[in-house]
Amino acid sequence: LENLRIPVARRPEYRYLDVEPEFITTARDLAYVTLQENNAIGVFHLRKRAWVKTYPLGRLPLVIDASDRDGPFGSRAIALNDQVHGLPMPDSLTSFRIGSRTYLATANEGDPLSSRKDSMRAKRAGAHGPSLDPSYRQRLKERYGSDPLLDANLGRLQVSTIDGDTDGDGDLDELTAF
């Protein structure tokens, strides 16, 4: 469990309470289990009845339109120019074989837990959002030429308040979307 994203703060001996299986697929003697809120896939050996491994899925670089614009039929065209990171957070899952290899396909669904504790760990990036590292805020300001956290820029984007602090100093060094 050391490498899993555990969104609710607990004492280490109780971290297992926040591992939440979502979907399961099987291939031979293995069951693959999506752990959505933990942003991981677990592997369970069916005959041995034991967990073999968990694979944290990390963060993915994304280019999206996080603005408050509606797109082609609205006030302006979609502008895919916002660079953020996203959590895959796998939901449904299937497996298939090609030759001797097993592959997994997931439908990813970034979503904070519905509990009050986890909902506090997801905020809009706007004016009252999470604290940003000053150098990161400056880079965003240079990119947007104005306040990057206006709704017309990144302000409406729902971000994690725990996944973008890459240096552990308490502020976000990268925006990580759900």
Tell where the protein language model's regions lie, with residue ranges:
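Beta-sheet-rich non-transmembrane sensory/scaffold domains
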Residues: 1-178
